[in-house]
A protein has these predicted regions:
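Single conserved hydrophobic/aromatic residue that forms the stacking wall/gate
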Residues: 1-7, 11-12
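Solvent-exposed loop/turn segments at secondary-structure junctions
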Residues: 9, 37-40, 75-80, 123-126, ...
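Ligand-binding "clamshell"
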Residues: 13-28, 126-145
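A bilobed periplasmic-binding-protein/Venus flytrap-type ligand-binding module shared by bacterial periplasmic
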Residues: 30-38, 152-168
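Ligand-binding pocket segment of bilobal, Venus flytrap-like solute-binding proteins
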Residues: 74-139
């Protein structure tokens, strides 16, 4: 489809200087996950920043048992990693013990290690790990949609203002931003913004 791209938050920030329009079609909650045995129930964005940059290295400093924190994340280039690192303000400064190529691998690594912490898209998190609250707010479709859960990213259609979309491209954008697309967006693992 000519003149239509799908991106994330970066597109919104850059749209005015790049002469493009950004239309948010969905949101993705990025859940903070720990091993089910962890005593930690809630973390602040600031504590996450301190943990992922190596300033805090022991679980006892955030309410857990004594033990070295094992940071698990996605590989460089991952959209989930980019979203997490941008929101928590740890871009290029994380001290990962493991950088994995798939969300399922991150979840499995956290499940297998009682000292691990990682992040994953809300839709991928099941009952094998525990999603902690962030500043007292759980990661759920409702809290992502209402904005109270802080670690989330938008999925954005980006279109060039100086080019008229083709009929097919416009029809696709219209459908993707309609209530009719909500179930498809949810099935794909994101939170629809139009219902």
């Amino acid at each position: 489809i000519a003149s239509c791209l799908v991106g994330s938050e970066m597109c919104i920030r850059d749209r005015e200087k790049n002469d493009v329009d950004g239309t948010v079609i969905a949101l993705d909650g990025i859940a903070i996950i720990v091993n089910k045995a962890s005593k930690v129930e809630d973390l602040t964005v600031d504590k996450l920043k301190q943990m992922f940059t190596g300033e805090i290295t022991n679980w006892k400093d955030v309410g857990g048992d004594d033990g070295e924190i094992v940071l698990v994340g996605r590989e460089a280039g991952s959209g989930t990693r980019d979203g997490f690192e941008s929101i928590v303000d740890v871009k290029d400064s994380c001290k990962y013990a493991q950088e994995l190529t798939a969300t399922g691998a991150v979840i499995s690594a956290v499940e297998a290690n009682p000292l691990a912490i990682g992040y994953a898209s809300l839709s991928a998190v099941g009952d094998t790990v525990k999603a902690v609250t962030v500043e007292g707010v759980e990661c759920s479709e409702d809290t992502v949609k209402d904005g109270s859960y802080k670690i989330q990213r938008p999925f954005v259609f980006v279109t060039n203002k100086s080019v008229t979309l083709s009929e097919q491209a416009q029809a696709f954008v219209d459908f993707a931003t309609s209530k009719d697309a909500a179930d498809l967006i949810r099935t794909a693992g994101a939170v629809p913004v139009n219902e």
